[in-house]
Amino acid sequence: MVIRITPIAYYRNIGISAHIDAGKTTTTERILFYTGVNHKIGEVHTGSATMDWMEQEQERGITITSAATTCFWSGMAKQFPVHRINIIDTPGHVDFTIEVERSMRVLDGVVMVYCGVGGVQPQSETVWRQANKYKVPRIAFVNKMDRMGANYLHVVEELKTKLFANPVPIQLAIGSENKFTGVVDLIKMKAINWNDSDQGVTFFYEDIPNDLIELSNFWRNHLVESAVEESEELLDKYLSNSTQLTEYDIKQALRKRVLKNEILLVTCGSAFKNKGVQSMLDAVVEYLPSPTDLVSVKGILKKDGCALEERYVKDSEPFSALAFKVATDPFVGNLTFFRVYSGVVNSGDSIFNSVKEKRERFGRIVQMHANKREEIKSVYAGDIAAAIGLKDVSTGDTLCDCNHPIILESMEFPDPVISVMVEAKTKLDQEKMGLALSRLSQEDPSFRVWIDQDSGQTIIAGMGELHLEILVERMRREFSIEANVGKPQVAYRETIRSVIKQEGKFIRQSGGRGQFGHVWLLLEPMNINNESSSDSYKFFNKIVGGVIPKEYIPAVDKGIQEQISNGVLAGYPIVGVSVTIFDGSYHEVDSSEIAFKIAGSIAFKEGFMRANPVLLEPIMKVEIETPEEYMGDVIADLNRRRGIISNLENSMNIGRIIHAKVPLSEMFGYATALRSQTQGRASHSMEFLKYNEVPNNIAQSIIESRRVK
């Protein structure tokens, strides 16, 4: 019989996400303190944060990997049954956006942390889009209200104008900067103050300060009006007599609207000063979904099929789970993190990887707390845990009951935009490096490794300079491999702009049996998804009447795909091309798979060069915050870098914010240049935006330099 300690309705699977430096990890550390997981508060600036357990995280003061933990909460006033909160603390730097992506896929709700000074910053927008993609309900916590320049209502306005959210504050800040003392609860219409003597463990209610009564009434009305929009019945009740609305009515209506992603409830505080995190935890329990709010999860029966399959979020259903992360642990080997959607699984059980169509066996199952492990015997619907001993599981694979297969929706991974050459310093390290890179790429789907066919060098590619720097550093620390690293290279792509028909023939007679392959291909440009290359090539078979036997068609496709990987114009991967094989011929004796593979390759290569081929380059979305006096110099420098200024706005911190689109090739070393231009007073962030055509004169020099190599 299944014994579940916490009812599934009392589960909350949440993420903590934000822009870098919004105080996200500090917020998580306070959560661990107030829920009793930690008896001492960890701090990012001292390198003692529980969730930032990697050495690089402690040294740099940033989150690099998504860390998982579990805590329990029964409310500030112990007003709830005990709720189990599974938390994933995700990175804020755009180079590690894959960690956010895979966490969003398996979470039920998210707490978006915003800086009370910086407001909605670039990575905040990226995380918001990722949450939208997976339709994850969320609440907001405006942090750092004790900081100079903090402005709560300005951040609320930015949530509306920058994210197009529908923010509904359920709290107001009492004071700001060094006068920030607590919050106004707009539902109870009381002031909440936390006791400094016990680091905010206890609190007390007070009357709202006189200077905030008018503002509180205004935002209280806004909150109630947002709540009653949930149903006509509630609206009628409100219009007939607004005093009839109970606290329960308001909270239930707000919760329903949060679950439908119609509103964003906003709370505030200062995690560092131990104020506001406690009431934000109450909001997690009251407004974010439990796994049962999902009701059921849908998937398909087979990889190539479209027959839908459904699992209800119950322990009694067949087991189904999604592997969302694979990590290497120095003590136990591979750790596979997974989210259980239905059923129960025990350590020692056999399960089925429905994506790879392989049976696996759960060795040990562990509950993770950052990098610490607690062994458990069973996991239930709604749980997030890690398995030790799974041999061939990748991020995005479905794990399920052997007798009841299902394939759940996976996740998309961005293609790398930057690459470098790596070379081990010793021959012994060279042999170990292959294994190390293989393990690192298994952990991180946005990290790629390959051998350059011409030079024989090992190339690694990722989402940015910091991303690759961290991975090379991990090779040194975790695998004891010292490596030389080349200069960063841009991940260019090749594509076509015209439609073309092209013949390809491969005929060879050398006495005895010869070789014969003959195809006609139609090459067409197609729109590409800039985030992933998974849909950047399509192959269609329009052969009729048996002019080419069907067993040779896959060989033609294979020949084309090899050319696509190696490039035609300058040796870069090809994207955005649709190929149709529509005619050709064969020889009953001399035709073979290899002959048609070569014929397909020849036709594609020659057709590509006739179809107006172009080079594409990654364009970065760049945001620069600079004092007003340096703005002219910064903009002039961006123009020299082929940048396009898309917007200028006033900064909540200093001066102005410049929004620009700049080719990645022009941004290497930009941090140093910006520091010298502005005497170290400006800051910038950038993330991949899209691929654009390289101007002809620059493309020609790139092509020539590749030919010389």
Curated annotation (Swiss-Prot):
Keyword Transmembrane: no
GO terms of molecular function: GTP binding; GTPase activity; guanosine tetraphosphate binding; translation elongation factor activity
Record key words, sorted: Cytoplasm, Elongation factor, GTP-binding, Nucleotide-binding, Protein biosynthesis
GO BP term, example: ribosome disassembly
Positions with a binding annotation for GTP: 18-25, 89-93, 143-146
Subcellular location: Cytoplasm
tr-type G domain location: 9-292
GO cellular component: cytoplasm
Pfam families cross-referenced by the UniProt entry: EFG_C, EFG_III, EFG_IV, GTP_EFTU, GTP_EFTU_D2
Family: Belongs to the TRAFAC class translation factor GTPase superfamily. Classic translation factor GTPase family. EF-G/EF-2 subfamily.
Family annotation (PANTHER family): RIBOSOME-RELEASING FACTOR 2, MITOCHONDRIAL, TRANSLATION ELONGATION FACTOR G-RELATED
NCBIfam families: EF-G (TIGR00484), PRK12740.1-5 (NF009381), small_GTP (TIGR00231)
Function: Catalyzes the GTP-dependent ribosomal translocation step during translation elongation. During this step, the ribosome changes from the pre-translocational (PRE) to the post-translocational (POST) state as the newly formed A-site-bound peptidyl-tRNA and P-site-bound deacylated tRNA move to the P and E sites, respectively. Catalyzes the coordinated movement of the two tRNA molecules, the mRNA and conformational changes in the ribosome.
Name listed for the protein in its UniProt record: Elongation factor G
Organism whose genome encodes this protein: Blochmanniella floridana
